[in-house]
Amino acid sequence: MNAAVMTSPTNFSDYVIADLSLSAWGDKEIRIAETEMPGLMAIREEFAAAQPLKGARITGSIHMTIQTAVLIQTLEALGAKVRWASCNIYSTQDHAAAAIAAAGTPVFAVKGETLDDYWEYTHRIFEWPNDDKGAPVYSNMILDDGGDATLLLHLGTRAEKDASVLNNPGSEEEICLFNSIKKHLAVDATWYSKRLPQILGVTEETTTGVHRLYQMHKEGKLAFPAINVNDSVTKSKFDNLYGCRESLVDGIKRATDVMIAGKVAVIAGYGDVGKGSAQAMRALSAQVWVTEIDPICALQAAMEGYRVVTMEYAAEHGDIFVTCTGNYHVITHEHMKKMKDQAIVCNIGHFDNEIEVAALKQYTWENIKPQVDHIIFPDGKRIILLAEGRLVNLGCGTGHPSYVMSSSFANQTIAQIELYANTKNYPVGVYTLPKHLDEKVARLQLKKLNAQLTTLTTEQANYIGVQQTGPYKPEHYRY
């Protein structure tokens, strides 16, 4: 596998990062991560000569971590040009951003950036230098995580026609987003509508962003095709489950040093993220309770031996609370008023509004260390809020391990190649990658683990009605 060569272009300044001097550290960690990312590195090696992304100008909005740096270098090795920002104000690893900037890639990401900065950086990843003849250059692909880059172009284009769509922000984040759009429209009244039609498609990483895409398409608002990377089996059943199983506890431990054994850990939501989170807590001998709205998921939790309760009941009994739903106000102000002194509250879903953090602003906040706060209630009770309700594994830790991110990012790279090279095959809509590509990613990942795959005989393949080389399961199969 060929590692990317890092070069330092002279007079390059198209970036906003914390500290360029961290680049050597970042580069060393990138080299280590490459050895743990067999799927992604194999894709890089397979397609490097063909340059399938030559001409692609990718706007990337995804956590600026060491693993993402390997993804960026892979996209570039396949011919793409990229501009990058983080999709979360706390998830950037500053040494990773420094390494990417030092290599000459435009990156706009600082751990702990403000929301105003966040939306400014999201605009910056759509702003390319003019070409040699002075003509404007625009992004033609988006690689998104949570859907913010996609949202920005769509909402901004609507605001050009009807400014009233920016009149009623529902959160602090929307206030910053709307103000940022107004600021750019004041300078260029067609900033968004010039860029939106240039986009050939988007590949979306996470559950929350995929939900947004399906909703936009249902409402007739989606302007370009999208590939739902999240629902590739080698993404959702691995990144979401096994990634969270390792990174959740890492984030909580780094933030609090709490002893988990014996504690009541309340896991809100029992999808793939919730399943991994519950397994992690049980592995450290917590008493795991689960809250769920879906009777099927609730039954799964019960059959695994978890106690299924409501949040109303759990609030006054739990020691550690983790939201994993992708929904809104799963832990409310009223729930937190009932909690024990020193209860730990955190989120591992994409957005911070799973916890009603805005309602806590009325109380005294005592910062313990970065991304760890005591919220002091009028009666003197304190709860510990991690990462201000944003992703605890990335805000307080370093996120998922490289190996599991290799599966996700191999899928992202394949999806970018497919959508860029075969745009005409994809009218506006939301698509998933075919199963044979899912199986390909799994095969590439297995090599690192020295696994031995059994090969079907011709008779066996004929008996179950599949090809010897797969795919082995029908599209409707639930892994």
UniProtKB/Swiss-Prot annotation:
UniProt keyword annotation of Lyase present: no
CDD domains to which the protein is assigned, alphabetical: SAHH (cd00401)
Record Pfam families: AdoHcyase, AdoHcyase_NAD
Top-level taxon of origin: Bacteria
Residues at which substrate binds: T65, D145, E205, K235, D239
GO CC annotations, alphabetized: cytosol
Keyword annotations from UniProtKB, A to Z: Cytoplasm, Hydrolase, NAD, One-carbon metabolism
GO terms for biological process, alphabetical: L-homocysteine biosynthetic process; one-carbon metabolic process; S-adenosylmethionine cycle
Pathway linked to the protein: Amino-acid biosynthesis; L-homocysteine biosynthesis; L-homocysteine from S-adenosyl-L-homocysteine: step 1/1
NAD found in the keyword field: yes
Cofactor stoichiometry and binding remark: Binds 1 NAD(+) per subunit.
Cellular localisation: Cytoplasm
Catalytic activity: S-adenosyl-L-homocysteine + H2O = L-homocysteine + adenosine
UniProt main location, coarse: cytoplasm
Cofactor: NAD(+)
GO MF, one example: adenosylhomocysteinase activity
EC number: 3.13.2.1
Chain residues that bind NAD(+): 206-208, 240, 269-274, 292, 327, 348-350, 393
Alphabetical list of InterPro entries matching this protein: Adenosylhomocyst_ase-like_sf, Adenosylhomocysteinase-like, Ado_hCys_hydrolase_NAD-bd, NAD(P)-bd_dom_sf, S-Ado-L-homoCys_hydrolase_CS
Annotated function: May play a key role in the regulation of the intracellular concentration of adenosylhomocysteine.
Cited NCBIfam families: ahcY, PRK05476.2-3
Family: Belongs to the adenosylhomocysteinase family.
HAMAP family: AdoHcyase
Name recorded for this polypeptide: Adenosylhomocysteinase
Native source species: Janthinobacterium sp. (strain Marseille)
